[in-house]
A protein has these predicted regions:
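A short, N-terminal "cap"/entry segment at the start of jelly-roll beta-barrel domains
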Residues: 1-51, 146-181
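Conserved short histidine dyad/triad with adjacent acidic residue
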Residues: 36-42, 55-71, 105
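Short strand-coil-strand connectors
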Residues: 50, 87-91
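Short, conserved beta-strand element in jelly-roll/cupin
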Residues: 56-61, 69-88, 126-128
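Short acidic-glycine-tyrosine-enriched beta hairpin
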Residues: 76, 90-106
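Ligand-binding loop in jelly-roll beta-barrel domains
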Residues: 85, 105-132
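Surface-exposed, gly/pro-biased binding rims or lids
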Residues: 126-160
């Protein structure tokens, strides 16, 4: 029998502390936010899921979800609300509510908030090859991504280099307006 891993309250929201099944409302979960960065809902808690990464990102207009990158595993995205701009393989694609994006392994991509208000994106990614692996993926120079402030000046595989110009996101409680009613 698989035990319940009931999320525990913290100053920045409820957090799952162990293995097991649980139910958690996104508004009650721990979030991370920082200046010029997307806010994201930490659904996994203190222990990352071993097979699948999942989170909810809230992108203000012009704010990238991530630096332009590729991963050794597939990633998928579903726009839950608002508008965004997908940059994939050096091309731009507008996204709107209920658009689904599939990025097979090695597809270079990022998503940038667009439109008049916040965009909410569900992100899901496999964790077969990318966890604790030096060949997880990388950040590559791309002119389109750079034009949207979502690119790196030099190729790197180190997240700390790709995000060096940003303030690190800090744990926070859900803020009203991040998720649609």
């Amino acid at each position: 029998m698989v035990p319940e891993a009931r999320p525990e309250p913290t100053e920045s929201g409820h957090v799952s502390k162990g293995e097991g099944w649980f139910v958690l409302n996104a508004r009650d979960s721990r979030w991370y936010a920082g200046p010029g960065r997307s806010a994201f809902c930490d659904l996994e808690g203190d222990q990352d899921f071993s097979q699948l990464g999942i989170n909810i990102n809230v992108l203000e207009p012009g704010v990238p979800m991530a630096m332009y990158h590729w991963e050794a595993d597939q990633e998928d995205f579903l726009v839950l609300a608002g508008e965004a701009l997908l940059i994939i393989e050096g091309e731009e694609r507008p996204l709107r509510q209920w658009d689904f994006v599939h990025c097979p392994a090695k597809a270079k991509h990022t998503i940038v908030g667009a439109g008049a208000g916040p965009c909410v994106v569900l992100a899901v990614g496999a964790r077969v090859l990318s966890v604790d692996n030096p060949d997880w993926g990388g950040y590559t120079v791309d002119e389109v991504a750079l034009r949207h402030d979502a690119g790196v000046p030099d190729d790197t595989t180190k997240p700390e280099e790709a995000y060096s110009r940003f303030t690190k996101r800090q744990p926070t409680a859900y803020r009203e307006g991040w998720l649609p009613d």
